[in-house]
């Protein structure tokens, strides 16, 4: 047998739940074509994996790599840990969808997190256009959510207040466009800028669109209102809209049993709700200050 790449002598864990095995892996093109005892095979490249685990690439379902995937062709801090796919657009904040004005605002807001400069902006507006900009830029794969703060800022700006009917139509159109362009779901960060002004009814209406596509609602809940109260809201959004719910970095590991009981008690019918826990103290806060010179002087 002939391969482009032969990985020999490793311990294969295939991700299916099957027991680990000692095996070789043969690859041709971008496909694994054989797993087993392949010592008789030849290949252009041979990797000695003795003492190592050979596994499918890991998917990082919560990160803020949005800008780094655009700026760097290779991020060793992720690939050396085995991450081959990044799911971006989390916590309701990213670099798309935008218009010319909100693009500037989001680049400024996310500067410390993702490091993009205005000079890095290539004119994208829709989520699909931004993902197209990522194509071929980085060795990793990428999937994205529709980030709700970006969507809401397009319709309502960055101020307080609830949405009116016209703004809601705009929001739903942009979310629908994002889902049609391949987004896996909608993300929110309800402690953060813009989306903190969205009430439960607003989020249910938007998630109705996401549910049409079988998408996911990934939420950094409204933790500042109290973990259990925030949990009740997340479950209600899933129940009323029919959307699948993913709770980002659940803050309350010591109350996990209470949280599970809370979810079960709240469900008159089953919904797909899954928490992902935050095992340590939160380490990120955000302060949004208008970057007009007079505001900066007042702050200093």
Language-model segments: residues:
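Active-site environment of divalent metal-dependent phosphoester hydrolases
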Residues: 66-68, 93-97, 152, 191-195, ...
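Divalent metal-coordination and catalytic microenvironments
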Residues: 10, 30, 51, 62, ...
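Histidine-rich, glycine-flanked metal-binding segment
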Residues: 1-57
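Divalent-metal coordination cores built from histidine and acidic residues
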Residues: 71-184
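Active-site neighborhoods of metal-dependent hydrolases
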Residues: 130-134, 138-165, 171-192, 207, ...
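Di-metal (Zn2+ and/or Mg2+/Mn2+) metal-binding site signature of metallo-dependent hydrolases
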Residues: 53-77
